[in-house]
Amino acid sequence: VWHAADPSQYPPMDVHGTLPWSVLDAASPRWRERVTWWRDHGVDDTSPRAHAQGMIATGRHGRISGGVSRFDPHLAEVCYRWFCPPGGHVLDPFAGGPVRGLVAGHLGMPYTGVDLSAAQTAANRARAADWELAGLSAGGTVWIDGDAADVLPRLDGRYDYLLTCPPYHNREKYSDDPRDLSAMRWGVFVDALRGIVAAAVDRVK
């Protein structure tokens, strides 16, 4: 958990009923209630990925999410509250949908996300603009189009916290772009992922 020099500045440990125990129960009523609040306010937008080439269309995941992975907004919320300084700048090299950016903006934390899909980043910016108009976000959410391997070394400054969700190799295939990790063979994927993670860590204070 992030610690301030002055204990009086420690962040709240109780985040809508979730406490920093060893096991987080995402099936608990309080957790589900908070996830519902976020999603009722439009925290996610999976439409740019809904027609990607290879989604998980079978089993429970295919039934509840149309085969598109969705980042848990309350998980993002507790991670930010517990591990990022108040107002800290978040870096996300595999941004995907808008969840982590919108949650950061709602909590008053600047956010910089990078994603290869221009359609997804455009959708994210549109959703963020809606949130700012509705008073749900303090702004400061930025999405950059491009390959994180190229973008990260060019970023200015340092970041306070790194939170991301890398591709699951070929479990979800987004495009045939040779820079797309989901289109790579396993060995190439691992090397590319390691390089991007190392570059992202290098940008953190």
What residue ranges belong to the model's regions?
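Helix-to-beta-strand junctions that scaffold the AdoMet/dcAdoMet cofactor pocket
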Residues: 203-205
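Conserved S-adenosyl-L-methionine
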Residues: 76-151, 200
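Mobile active-site "lid"/loop adjacent to the S-adenosyl-L-methionine
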Residues: 158-199
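S-adenosyl-L-methionine
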Residues: 1-85
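A short His-aromatic
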Residues: 55-58, 83, 154, 169-174, ...
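Short amphipathic alpha-helix with an adjacent loop that forms part of the alpha/beta core around
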Residues: 151-157
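Short, well-ordered alpha-helical scaffold segments within catalytic/effector domains
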Residues: 72-77, 149, 190, 194-197
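Pocket-edge positions in alpha/beta enzyme catalytic cores
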Residues: 64, 68, 113, 181-188
